[in-house]
């Protein structure tokens, strides 16, 4: 456990209906008939539910579960504006969606957030006057956890989170990151590659996994974005997210849902790629049997 059971220190209040309505009102500005928009709306609600369940599985009280839940509602706000501006969800081809979302919600920039004292290095340095340029007030009346929420949103898509974080901040960041990873596996099975990446099903099934990505996969860590060159590399990158799951509930949910196994069983028209995925499937099956224990984070 990153924080002791029952160790949530202050009462935080969330009106879930208000937060849901604010999210729906915000996304009404975008075309919900677009599969890409629908994808992210549905993803958001599933991640928020998973966040609450993960926090509850770690023995946290209702106020902490609510805090985790609302982080899920807020975590991908930037995706919709990213899609409108750039026509893609690929951060490397557009903008960092996590930073954009936090900017929209909190009305400041990443540099301003970094300068703010106490945002990630303390359990108590959270209270900040809200920037009225942001829209976080549409979702939440209680501002006592704004800094923690902003930190979690800005950190949810990073390869690694800041080691200087307090245990409490790290706990909530890991809850959000786990929930997001669990549902990303589902999204990559349920939606066509055209709706997620700048590629087609044909391209995906007729390319190979690059050697760098194969080597990285065997190191049992998530694959860095800069290594991904081919459409198949992106699928392997998604599979590799399972290496970074922190909580036992998350691993159990992945096993129950079955999407990780389905991605590992990807069928390619290229015989070399097919052999690569057979190796990926066997390696991931072995890893999941011996994954770190409950709440443990890997070193290295």
Please provide the spans of the model-predicted regions:
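Hydrophobic/aromatic-rich structural module bridging two neighboring secondary-structure elements via a short loop
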Residues: 80-121, 131-148, 159
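Acidic/His-rich, divalent-metal-binding segments that scaffold phosphate/diphosphate chemistry
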Residues: 5-99, 125-128, 132, 166
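Short low-complexity stretches enriched in small and charged residues
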Residues: 23-29, 133-143, 191-198
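Alpha-helical scaffolds flanking conserved acidic
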Residues: 61-74, 118-120, 143-153, 169-175
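Divalent metal-dependent phosphate-bond-processing catalytic cores, especially two-metal-ion Mg2+/Mn2+ enzymes
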Residues: 10-12, 36-45, 49-61, 74, ...
């Amino acid at each position: 456990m990153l924080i002791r059971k029952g160790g949530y220190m202050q009462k935080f209040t969330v009106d879930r209906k208000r937060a849901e309505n604010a999210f729906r009102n915000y996304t009404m500005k975008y075309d919900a008939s677009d599969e890409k928009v629908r994808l992210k709306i549905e993803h958001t609600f599933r991640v928020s539910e998973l966040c609450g369940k993960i926090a509850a599985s770690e023995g946290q009280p209702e106020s902490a579960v609510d805090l985790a839940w609302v982080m899920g509602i807020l975590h991908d706000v930037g995706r919709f504006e990213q899609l409108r501006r750039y026509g893609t969800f690929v951060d490397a081809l557009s903008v960092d969606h996590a930073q954009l979302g936090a900017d929209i919600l909190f009305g400041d920039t990443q540099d301003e957030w970094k300068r703010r004292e106490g945002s990630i290095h303390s359990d108590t340095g959270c209270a900040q006057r809200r920037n009225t340029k942001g829209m976080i007030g549409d979702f939440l009346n209680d501002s006592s956890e704004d800094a923690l929420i902003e930190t979690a949103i800005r950190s949810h898509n990073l390869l690694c989170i800041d080691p200087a974080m307090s245990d409490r901040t790290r706990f909530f960041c890991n809850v959000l990151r786990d929930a997001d990873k669990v549902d990303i596996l589902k999204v990559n099975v349920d939606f066509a590659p055209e709706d997620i990446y700048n590629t087609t099903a044909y391209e995906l099934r007729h390319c190979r996994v690059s050697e760098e990505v194969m080597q990285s996969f065997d190191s049992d860590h998530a694959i860095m974005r800069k290594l991904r060159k081919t459409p198949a590399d992106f699928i392997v990158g998604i599979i590799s997210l399972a290496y970074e799951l922190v909580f036992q509930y998350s691993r159990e949910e992945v096993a129950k849902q079955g999407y990780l196994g389905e991605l590992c069983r990807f069928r390619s028209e290229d015989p070399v790629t097919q052999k690569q995925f057979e190796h990926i499937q066997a390696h991931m099956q072995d890893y999941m049997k011996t994954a770190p224990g409950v709440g443990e984070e890997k070193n290295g």
